């Protein structure tokens, strides 16, 4: 059997909640708002598949560049390149200074 090349390959532990985090996500995560230029961390919520960024960006930090519908456009550094990542607010968390 050949290896799969799907979007969620190699994410067995990356997209897994701990025992205490299991269940429905709080509504406050869905209605949180961010401003342009704000720094946020990508923290994928595996219980919500819609608007999920690519798992390779899990744990990375980016700057909010704009909004597209309910989703936010982030600018994230990947190596030497700057990438644009589109994500729903459920998968983002504000950076604390």
Swiss-Prot record:
GO terms for biological process: translation. GO terms for molecular function: structural constituent of ribosome. The keyword Translocase does not apply. One of its GO terms (cellular component) is ribosome. It comes from the Archaea. InterPro entries: Ribosomal_eL21, Ribosomal_eL21_arc, Ribosomal_eL21_CS, Ribosomal_eL21_sf, Translation_prot_SH3-like_sf. Keywords: Ribonucleoprotein, Ribosomal protein. HAMAP family: Ribosomal_eL21. Belongs to the eukaryotic ribosomal protein eL21 family. This is Large ribosomal subunit protein eL21. It comes from Methanosarcina barkeri (strain Fusaro / DSM 804). The lineage of its organism: Archaea, Methanobacteriati, Methanobacteriota, Stenosarchaea group, Methanomicrobia.
